[in-house]
């Protein structure tokens, strides 16, 4: 390569500075900067202070060289070669006299023939990956300009060949200059398209009337697909939301699309409705969050767009948010807080882009009682004509709503919908019969109520055994893996060992059902035992409960076996027998009144040697749901409830019939129905009478539902597997596969599966809501290897055999997936939540509690795949109770409640931890680390984890430190991080290699 050199012009936000003047009389001042799209040109050196690369601090193999011509100073810096990937860096120390925005211009050579990348760090924090276009050869030099906001004083600017970069460039110097403000492309708030920077075939035209200014811009034709663009340079007078209104013509007869880029980054695809003809003009407004100052707004005909429009002008104004919905008797559910998919975009306080079939928002609402309920949709329709959307309630079509024009103001449309007690979904969807084209702000539901602040909203009350009264033994807290206490909720339980032993509670609500989480002995050869336990209400025996330990007890090394003879495995954790608990559920013979005494008692006929009671759930179950109109029942195809026969073919035949005859879906009535092979799902609605009534039973191991396409709905049923040990080579999930676009899984209860949900690539916009995953042998929910735009919400997972909730980027990254309002409780192995690589994934408004082994409250890591973290990974508004645990087998270290851990590469995506409560962490509250951790003096790791933001984090009680780092560099910015009750101290910063920038409000460390 020689040492690692394009003559390029100075770039500014994706444009190239061609000259520093324009003649007066074209809408600009006499002195200005002219911008064009990136391309070849002669070099222009930015004015300002110049820092030679050979005088910078060099590391990781970066060296001074002189073997190529054209450099400034006494040499240039090379060594950014593949052999130094992950290490080579040049760090400039610059001085700023006054705070402001600065152009940082790097002079470089790149003779590789293609663009190469480096990473730019400011004061130790990575701010971006930069692209350095190819220069003509290694003796020619180009420049790359980045705009940075810098405070007065000294700063470090570091260009590093990170593990995610391609490197192989030479660096000559760095020029720092106060930013000159580019002129607006027009006068005032109106920017004419003919004055924008045009590229890729976009041209000025005048052959259609009605345009403003001196012309319009065309050329967005199929021949220029992937290239044509118009870039406006605009000025935002103040930080905030701004409405960017594009005036355009679209005479094609149908909606067309372009892509909108802000400051070089694509933010959305926009839809431009048809205008009457090419001489008529329409507008499209997008609300953008912009900082004060200059920005570029680029409208491009990307390869994924349909183009074929003309552009006239752009108007930028401060956005006026919709006024708050009028107050009334209803509860307001904000649209931007709901699940949405199908191209719908989120603005600061509402949703837009209901512009094509498949666009939808699903409101999750909560009621105290079933009723015909008034709901009011707050919307905006500035089209001048009526628009329509279809409305679905809990997945069933309810009506088509017509939304009258509103002009530029928000209005409301009220409907009456039949809603059930508890959680409901109300979907507003653009189907093929609709016209869409509205914005949606909120839904007001009369007699609606708030969802749980954190964690899943559930219909039952969970009561801990140790919180009741008992004459038996209360187990004391213990977190030693392999003990029954460590597997108990709150680390305590009650053990009934003698006839007459009981534990009892006062019922906080009326209930007609009961779930018991309990432990009993195993059979000597494994396989479990069956025994009874007695249920009393107000001193009178209500019924005998039939219990089993068949799905408890595992042995040996990972992944553990059902037999006590299962051998240990070298290098695998083997604590001895564990997985002591299982659960059983019961619809009761009569209801329990609120305030009644509920007692579990070991009577003379209850023959197990002991019953360890961890907790109970009390729930008032509603009556079975009826079959909706236009559904076909599986009983019409030979399925028989509760007969122990195989019903797989009947279900498959019903699905085939529903598709071929245009029926709305397939009905599975009350009762138990058996499957012994896979049931494939695509473009079908499968529905039951409710998870307490409709029960799908896997008669062997591994039968399940497989997603093979889009528009799948599975609602109101339970799946009970027949798994008794983990088999990573064979067993399947209850729900597995690709669910395409537009799918919904609601109110589904899963027990005794290997995995609850294993969602595969091709899934884009799945919503899983209002579910329970209990007693799985591996993960509860795993979004695996390329899942996009998917949300899991109001799901409660308990006693999973691996991560309760996991996003696992494996081969391909998961993008924009969210766990929100979920509860993860008592994973027997691993974490309550885990995010393995990916882009812009989120854990929000959730609760994790009582991890056991190899465990965190949330683990953020690249452990399993050499893939990056991109964008921002968010953990916000989450509570972790008694989480963290030993991780001695895999990493020879202990895990924090919040654990950010690197194994394969630098973690350079932003990690945001905000509004998080960490209570009684087993080890450290927050841990940031890298590698295996086997030695107190490991080989020095230079893979940074940065940037990290910790904001409004409370750590109350930790078995080790409040915050801990191990063998890792990087930077965390900390605001209002408080530590109390950490056994070993507030902070342990291994070798002082990690930088904590304390802003304000930090105490205890």
Question: Where are the regions that the model predicts?
Answer:
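Extracytoplasmic
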Residues: 47-627, 876, 914
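Right-handed parallel beta-helix
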Residues: 635, 689-692, 710-721, 741-752, ...
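N-terminal secretory signal peptides that target proteins for export/translocation
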Residues: 1-10
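Acidic Gly/Asp/Thr-rich repetitive segments characteristic of extracellular carbohydrate-active
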Residues: 634-667
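Short glycine/acidic-rich loop motifs that flank beta-strands on beta-rich extracellular proteins
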Residues: 663-664, 675-678, 691, 695-703, ...
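Extracellular beta-strand-rich solenoid/capping regions of secreted or surface-exposed proteins
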Residues: 652, 656-657, 673-686, 695-742, ...
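Bacterial Sec-dependent N-terminal signal peptides
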Residues: 22-47
């Amino acid at each position: 390569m020689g040492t690692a050199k394009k003559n390029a012009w100075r770039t500014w936000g994706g444009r190239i500075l061609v000259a520093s003047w324009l003649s007066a009389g074209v809408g600009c001042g006499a002195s200005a900067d002219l911008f064009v799209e990136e391309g070849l040109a002669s070099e222009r050196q930015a004015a300002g202070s110049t820092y030679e690369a050979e005088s910078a601090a060099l590391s990781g193999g970066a060296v001074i060289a002189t073997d190529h011509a054209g450099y400034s100073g006494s040499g240039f810096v090379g060594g950014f070669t593949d052999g130094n990937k992950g290490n080579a860096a040049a760090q400039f120390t610059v001085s700023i006299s006054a705070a402001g925005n600065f152009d940082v211009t790097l002079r470089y050579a790149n003779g590789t023939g293609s663009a190469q990348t480096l990473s730019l760090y400011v004061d130790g924090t990575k701010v971006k990956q930069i692209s350095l276009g190819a220069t003509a050869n290694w003796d020619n030099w180009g420049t790359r300009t980045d705009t940075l906001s810098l405070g007065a004083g000294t700063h470090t600017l570091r260009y590093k060949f990170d593990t995610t970069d391609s490197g192989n460039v030479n660096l000559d110097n760095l020029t720092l200059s106060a930013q000159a403000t580019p002129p607006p492309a027009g006068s005032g708030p109106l920017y004419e398209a003919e004055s924008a920077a045009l590229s890729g075939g976009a041209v000025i035209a005048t052959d259609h009337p009605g345009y403003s200014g001196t012309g319009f811009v065309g050329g967005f034709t199929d021949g220029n697909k992937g290239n044509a663009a118009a870039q406006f340079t605009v000025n935002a007078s103040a930080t905030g939301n701004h409405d960017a209104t594009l005036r355009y013509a679209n005479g094609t007869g149908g909606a067309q699309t372009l892509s909108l880029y802000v400051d070089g980054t694509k933010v959305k695809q926009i839809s431009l409705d048809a205008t009457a003809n090419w001489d008529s003009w329409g507008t499209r407004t997008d609300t953008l969050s912009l900082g004060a100052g200059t920005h570029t707004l680029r409208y491009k005909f990307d390869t994924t767009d349909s183009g074929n429009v003309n552009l006239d002008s752009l108007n930028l104004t401060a956005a006026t948010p919709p006024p708050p919905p009028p107050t009334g008797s209803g509860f307001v559910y904000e649209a931007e807080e709901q699940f949405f998919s199908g191209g719908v975009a989120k603005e600061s306080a509402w949703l837009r882009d209901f512009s094509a079939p498949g666009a939808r928002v699903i409101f999750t609402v909560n009621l105290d009682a079933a009723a015909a309920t008034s709901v009011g949709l707050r919307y905006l329709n500035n089209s001048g004509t009526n628009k329509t959307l279809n409305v679905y309630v809990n997945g069933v079509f309810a009506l088509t709503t017509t939304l009258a024009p509103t002009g530029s103001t928000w209005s409301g449309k009220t409907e009456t919908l039949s809603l059930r007690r508890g959680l409901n979904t109300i979907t507003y969807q653009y189907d093929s019969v609709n016209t869409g084209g509205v914005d949606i702000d909120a839904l007001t539901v009369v007699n609606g109520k708030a969802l749980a602040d954190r964690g899943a909203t559930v219909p039952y009350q969970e009561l801990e055994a140790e919180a009741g009264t008992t004459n038996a033994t209360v187990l004391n807290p213990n977190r030693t893996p392999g003990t029954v206490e460590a597997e108990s909720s709150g680390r305590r339980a009650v053990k009934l060992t003698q006839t007459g032993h009981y534990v009892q509670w006062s019922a906080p609500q009326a209930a007609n059902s009961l779930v018991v989480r309990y432990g009993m002995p195993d059979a000597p050869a494994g396989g479990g035992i069956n025994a009874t336990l007695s249920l009393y209400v107000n001193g009178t025996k209500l019924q005998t409960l039939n219990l089993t330990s068949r799905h408890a007890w595992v042995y040996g090394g990972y992944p553990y076996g059902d037999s006590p003879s299962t051998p240990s495995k070298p290098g695998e954790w083997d604590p001895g027998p564990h997985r002591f608990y299982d659960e059983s559920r019961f619809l009761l013979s009569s209801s329990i009144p609120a305030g009644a005494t509920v007692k579990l008692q070991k009577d003379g006929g209850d023959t197990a040697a002991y019953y360890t009671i961890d907790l109970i759930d009390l729930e008032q179950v509603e009556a079975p749901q009826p079959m909706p109109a236009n559904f076909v029942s599986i009983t019409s195809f030979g399925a028989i409830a509760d007969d122990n026969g195989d019903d797989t073919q009947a279900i498959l035949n019903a699905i085939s019939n529903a598709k071929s005859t245009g029926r709305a879906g397939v009905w599975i009535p009350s009762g138990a129905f058996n499957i012994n092979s896979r049931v494939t799902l695509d473009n079908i609605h499968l529905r039951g009478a409710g998870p307490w009534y409709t029960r799908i039973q896997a008669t062997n191991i591994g039968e399940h539902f497989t997603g093979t396409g889009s528009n799948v709905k599975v609602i109101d049923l339970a799946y009970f597997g027949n798994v008794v040990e983990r088999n990573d080579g064979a067993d399947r999930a209850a729900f597995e596969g690709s669910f395409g676009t537009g799918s919904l899984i609601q109110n589904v209860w899963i027990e005794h599966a290997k995995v609850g949900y294993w969602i595969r690539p091709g899934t884009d916009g799945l919503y899983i809501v209002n579910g329970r995953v209990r007693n799985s042998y591996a993960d509860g929910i795993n979004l695996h290897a390329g899942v996009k735009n998917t949300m899991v919400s109001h799901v409660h997972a308990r006693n999973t055999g691996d991560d309760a909730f996991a996003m696992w980027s494996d081969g391909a990254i998961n993008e924009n997936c969210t766990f929100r309002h979920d509860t993860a409780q008592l994973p027997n192995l691993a974490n309550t939540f885990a995010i393995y690589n990916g882009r812009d994934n989120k854990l929000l408004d959730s609760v994790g509690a009582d991890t056991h082994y190899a465990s965190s409250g949330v683990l953020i890591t690249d452990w399993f795949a050499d893939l990056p973290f991109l964008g921002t990974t968010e953990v916000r508004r989450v509570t972790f109770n008694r989480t963290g645990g030993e991780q001695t087998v895999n990493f020879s270290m202990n895990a924090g409640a919040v654990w950010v851990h690197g194994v394969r590469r630098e973690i350079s995506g932003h990690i945001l931890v905000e509004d998080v409560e960490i209570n009684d962490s087993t080890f450290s509250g927050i841990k940031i680390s890298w590698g295996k951790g086997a030695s107190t003096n490991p080989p020095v790791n230079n893979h940074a984890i940065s940037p990290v933001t910790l904001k409004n984090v409370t750590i109350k009680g930790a078995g080790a430190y409040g915050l801990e780092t191990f063998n890792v560099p990087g930077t965390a910015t900390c605001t209002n991080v408080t530590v109390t009750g950490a056994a070993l101290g507030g902070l342990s910063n291994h070798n002082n290699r990690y930088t904590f920038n304390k802003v304000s409000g930090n105490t205890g460390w």
